[in-house]
A protein has these predicted regions:
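Acidic, polar ligand-binding/catalytic clefts
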Residues: 1-34, 105, 109-111
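Short helix-loop capping/hinge motifs at secondary-structure junctions, enriched
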Residues: 24-34, 66, 123-130
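A ligand-binding cleft/hinge motif common to bilobed small-molecule-binding domains
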Residues: 1-5, 54-57, 76-113
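Short loop->beta-strand "edge-of-pocket" segments that line small-molecule binding or catalytic clefts
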Residues: 32-49
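Short helix-initiation/N-cap motifs at beta->coil->alpha
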Residues: 31, 66-80, 114
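Periplasmic-binding protein-like
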Residues: 14-21, 90, 94-136, 154
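Ligand-binding clefts/hinges and TM-proximal coupling segments of bilobed small-molecule sensing domains
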Residues: 41, 51-65, 106-108, 130, ...
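Hydrophobic residues within well-ordered alpha-helices
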Residues: 37, 77-79, 118, 131
C-alpha cells in the first residue's frame, strides 16, 4: 500500500516479533505463550500504531491489547505489572532487555520477516540507486554488522 506513494530502497535489515515477560514470570513460557496470552484474562502491552500492535491483535484476539506511546513506556508498564507481556520487535526487545530493563526477558521470537528500508520520492531514481549502493557497500564491508553489534541489535 505504501509503495503507491513512495519508492523503497533495498532492505537493509530484517526483524521479527518478540514476546517479552518479566524474568520472575514463570507462568508464561515459550511453549505455552500462545495459549496463555490468547484469553480474556491476558493483557498485552504494545507500542501504539506499530507492527507489534497489529501482530498482537491478529494472534491474540481474545486478549486485552493496551497501546503505549513508545517502547520504553511499554517496558516500564510491564515492570509495573500493568500487563502480562510486551509484544515488540525482536531488535527492540534485545536492546532494552540488555540495557535498562534487565528484569524483563524475551521468552519467544516469532519469525515475521519484517523488512526495513528507506522511503524515497518515487521520481528520484538517482537517489534510490545511490542509497541502494550505499546499503550494499556498508553491508559488504561489515559496517552494518559492526553497528548492529555495537548497539546490541540481534
Amino acid at each position: 500500500e505504501r509503495e503507491k506513494e513512495v519508492a523503497f530502497s533495498d532492505s537493509y535489515y530484517m526483524d521479527d516479533q518478540a514476546i517479552v515477560t518479566k524474568v520472575d514470570n514463570t507462568d508464561i513460557t515459550a511453549d505455552n505463550y500462545s495459549e496463555k496470552l490468547n484469553n480474556a484474562d491476558a493483557t498485552i502491552i504494545v507500542q501504539s500504531g506499530s507492527t507489534a500492535e497489529a501482530f498482537a491483535q491478529e494472534n491474540f484476539p481474545k486478549a486485552k491489547i493496551v497501546p503505549y506511546k513508545d517502547a520504553t513506556e511499554c517496558f516500564s508498564a510491564l515492570q509495573s505489572d500493568k500487563g502480562d507481556a510486551v509484544v515488540t520487535n525482536r531488535s527492540v526487545a534485545s536492546q532494552l532487555t540488555a540495557e535498562q530493563f534487565n528484569t524483563c526477558q524475551t521468552i519467544k521470537q516469532v519469525s515475521t520477516g519484517e523488512e526495513y528500508a528507506i522511503a524515497i520520492n518515487q521520481g528520484n531514481t538517482k537517489l534510490k540507486d545511490d542509497i541502494n549502493q550505499a546499503i550494499k557497500d556498508l553491508t559488504d564491508d561489515g559496517t552494518v554488522d559492526a553497528l548492529m553489534a555495537k548497539y546490541n541489535i540481534k
